[in-house]
């Protein structure tokens, strides 16, 4: 029975990674994610999960490392752009924040929160 449960977890590695993060086991999640990275280096979901984890851990460099890779795959991914916007906002890198806002609005013109950020920065 234990073997079957463990096999189930590892046959869905992204699900296992999310579970580790959800349970707050970040050290194990980083280790597990690093082991998966070669196989999932072009997997949008995996990269976003890793980037989100580093955002939770307040590591802007690693967050951007993964989120920029997501955006290489899908340039107008609103969730990835939003996360990138937040990191650059925290770093006070307003030119990049403006760029992210404009891309988000081009995909979702009803995003009033992003419009407000853009209006505030562009004055």
What residue spans do the PLM features occupy?
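Register position in tetratricopeptide repeats
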Residues: 22, 56, 90, 120-123
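Conserved structural position within tetratricopeptide repeats
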Residues: 35-38, 68-72, 103-106
């Amino acid at each position: 029975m234990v073997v079957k449960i463990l096999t189930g977890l590892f046959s869905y590695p992204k699900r296992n990674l999310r579970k580790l993060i959800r349970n707050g086991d970040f050290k194990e999640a980083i280790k597990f994610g690093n082991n998966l990275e070669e196989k999932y280096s072009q997997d949008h979901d995996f990269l976003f999960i890793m980037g989100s984890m580093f955002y939770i851990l307040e590591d802007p460099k690693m967050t951007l490392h993964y989120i920029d890779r997501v955006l290489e795959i899908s340039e107008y991914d609103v969730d990835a752009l939003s996360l990138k916007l937040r990191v650059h906002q925290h770093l006070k890198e307003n030119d990049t924040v403006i760029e992210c806002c404009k891309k988000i609005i081009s995909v979702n013109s009803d995003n009033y929160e992003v419009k407000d950020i853009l209006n505030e920065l562009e004055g």
